Design a protein with these regions (language model features):
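A glycine- and Lys/Arg-enriched "phosphate-lid" helix/loop adjacent to the NTP-binding pocket
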Residues: 42, 92-143, 158-161
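ATP-dependent small-molecule kinase phosphotransfer cores
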Residues: 25-81, 173-174, 178
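ATP-binding Walker
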Residues: 11
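NTP-dependent small-molecule kinase module
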Residues: 128-187
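Hydrophobic anchor at the beta1->P-loop junction of P-loop NTPases
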Residues: 5
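Pre-Walker A (Motif I) flank of P-loop NTPase domains
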Residues: 1-2
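Walker A/P-loop
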Residues: 14
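P-loop (Walker A) phosphate-binding loop of NTP-binding proteins
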Residues: 8, 20
Length: 187
């Protein structure tokens, strides 16, 4: 089973991937694969990001990992792969996301871009556009420590993504953050 582990940068993908690896799960860093296998087809200078040939990357993942038991495909593009069976979308409150990305030394404009993406559910919307809703869960990592998050993800896998109503898509909504800023400007 191929499981995409995705989310806006700063939601905890890399941290949880390290814990899952320590627990004997195979974790593939999609960004590393894209770099190593020359699936980068350009650069978006405005957004300071690489442009990845997702179709070719998908074919590579399908060809090399589809027959394995459980493989996590980690990265904020992993949900775009049609070859994955399940998707775990990690979410984080925008204020906490700002703190996490600031601690990583990110520039303000890039932090703002990612906060906006999180508020607008960009990754979740892209995920639902490519995968059946029953194959997708979303987890709020805002106040969750990494060990508890790892245990939760393992539980979700054991339950085969079923009976996890709390983690069904649509339970996390940061849209009030847009309104908060709007109302602060009015007052």
């Amino acid at each position: 089973m191929l499981i995409a582990l995705t989310g806006t940068p700063g939601t905890g993908k890399t941290s949880i991937s390290n814990i899952l690896s320590e627990n004997s799960f195979e974790v593939i860093d999609i960004n590393k694969v894209a770099d190593d296998e020359d699936f980068i087809i350009g650069n978006d200078e405005k957004r300071n990001s690489k442009i990845v040939d997702v179709d070719t990357l998908n074919g590579y993942i399908k060809e090399n990992y589809i027959k394995k038991d459980i493989v996590f495909i980690e990265g904020h593009l992993s949900h775009l792969l049609k070859s994955v069976d399940k998707v775990i979308v990690l979410r984080c409150h925008p204020d906490e996301l700002r703190k996490r990305l600031s601690q990583k030394g990110w520039k303000k404009e890039k932090i703002k871009e990612n906060m906006e993406a999180e508020i607008l559910d960009i990754i979740l919307c892209e995920t639902v556009d490519k995968h059946p809703k029953k194959s997708v869960v979303e987890i709020d990592t805002t106040n969750m420590n990494i060990s508890n998050l790892a245990a939760l993800i393992i539980e979700i896998i054991k339950n085969k993504f079923e009976h996890m109503k709390k983690y069904n898509i649509g339970n996390i909504d940061w849209s009030e953050e847009i309104l908060k800023d709007f109302y602060n400007k009015v007052e």
